[in-house]
């Protein structure tokens, strides 16, 4: 048979406009679709006619992973779909661990819940941050607590995946208590539920006032660092910001502290003509120059990613 191809595809947080063009193309090209049933339901309108669809329930991760690999070994073009990004608390790592000899494998990134809720809240991930799952289904709870303590001692903005479920109720309060030992009571804490969905809910609070009961299985929680704050946008929205500490900010995010620049004040850019035609050969970019040009840049919605690991 023809050599099979397996794409492990991230669907993003659930809204169609955050499904990447590459992910959409891999889904439309696939002759075999596998995934957790709610994720498969998201893409039914774009699957090619005649494609085989394997939609399974939670708890069958091993079976659907094996089925996706086997279909690719039979020469099929397979899209194995996951919420958010496939490499973040999802199916990319078990797929690669299970073994993919004899097939071509591609991991197609997706907008993960952490990034989706960051955009919803403002810019809480503007500086160094940690991502921790509070589910002890696959990780020992003592190890999770060790990681929470490290994030607390390092003053990292901390995003909690899988913060609470029907049977896991003590984990989030325990984690918040550890963070509260190292951060002021006024530290911003926000919860986003059903991110990028019609029923999206946002609660912005502080470490001192936050109530774990606000959190459900479709939620994610972001706890700020000691420098995080709430600011008000021009359209009078409350936003969560962690300063990047750019030297030109002077330590304040206040419009009256900064000059109103016009284009005449900006340094003159190099006058370079860019061609729409890509170069014939790839160009090596110096890592230091790239880091400078990127200005030192550092994800299953809260409803999609939390289904990954409950």
What do the PLM-derived regions correspond to, one by one?
Residues 1-16, 21-111, 211, 252-260:
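Class I S-adenosyl-L-methionine
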Residues 1-8, 76-78, 153-289, 294-296:
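A contiguous loop/helix-start segment that scaffolds small-molecule binding in enzyme catalytic cores
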Residues 11-18, 138-141, 203-205:
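Short gly/ser/thr-rich secondary-structure transition/capping motifs
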Residues 40-42, 61-62, 112-116, 137-140, ...:
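Short gly/pro/ser/thr-enriched loop/turn and capping motifs at secondary-structure boundaries
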Residues 69, 119-121, 145-149, 178-180, ...:
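A generic local secondary-structure boundary/capping motif
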Residues 84-157:
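Class I SAM-dependent methyltransferase SAM-binding "motif I" and its flanking Rossmann-like core
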Residues 289-310:
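Long, low-complexity, intrinsically disordered segments
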């Amino acid at each position: 048979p023809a050599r099979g191809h397996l794409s492990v595809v991230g669907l993003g947080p659930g809204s169609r406009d955050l499904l990447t063009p590459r992910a959409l193309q891999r889904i439309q090209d696939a002759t075999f679709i596998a995934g957790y049933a709610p994720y498969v339901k998201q893409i039914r309108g774009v699957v090619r006619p005649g494609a085989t669809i394997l939609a399974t329930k939670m708890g069958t991760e091993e079976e659907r992973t094996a089925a996706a690999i086997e279909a690719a070994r039979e020469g099929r073009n397979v899209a194995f779909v996951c919420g958010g990004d496939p490499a973040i608390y999802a199916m990319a790592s078990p797929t690669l661990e299970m073994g993919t000899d004899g097939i071509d494998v591609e991991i197609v990134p997706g907008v993960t819940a952490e990034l989706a809720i960051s955009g919803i809240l403002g810019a809480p991930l503007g500086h160094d941050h940690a991502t921790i799952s509070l589910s002890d289904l696959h990780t020992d709870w003592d190890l999770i607590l060790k990681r929470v303590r490290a994030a607390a001692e390092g003053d990292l903005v901390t995003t909690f995946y899988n913060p609470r479920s029907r049977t896991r109720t003590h984990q989030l309060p325990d984690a918040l208590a550890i963070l509260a030992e190292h951060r002021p009571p006024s530290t911003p804490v926000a919860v986003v539920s059903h991110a990028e969905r019609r029923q999206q809910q946002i609660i912005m609070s502080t470490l001192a006032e936050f109530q774990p009961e606000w959190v459900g299985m479709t939620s994610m929680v972001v706890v700020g660092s000691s420098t995080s704050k709430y600011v008000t946008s021009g359209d009078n929205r409350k936003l969560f910001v962690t300063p990047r500490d750019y030297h030109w900010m002077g330590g304040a995010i206040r419009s009256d502290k900064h000059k109103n620049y016009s284009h005449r004040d900006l340094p003159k850019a190099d006058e370079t003509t860019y061609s729409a035609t890509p170069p014939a050969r790839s160009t090596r970019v110096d890592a230091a120059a790239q880091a400078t040009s990127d200005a030192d840049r550092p994800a299953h919605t809260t409803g999609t990613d939390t289904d990954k690991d409950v």
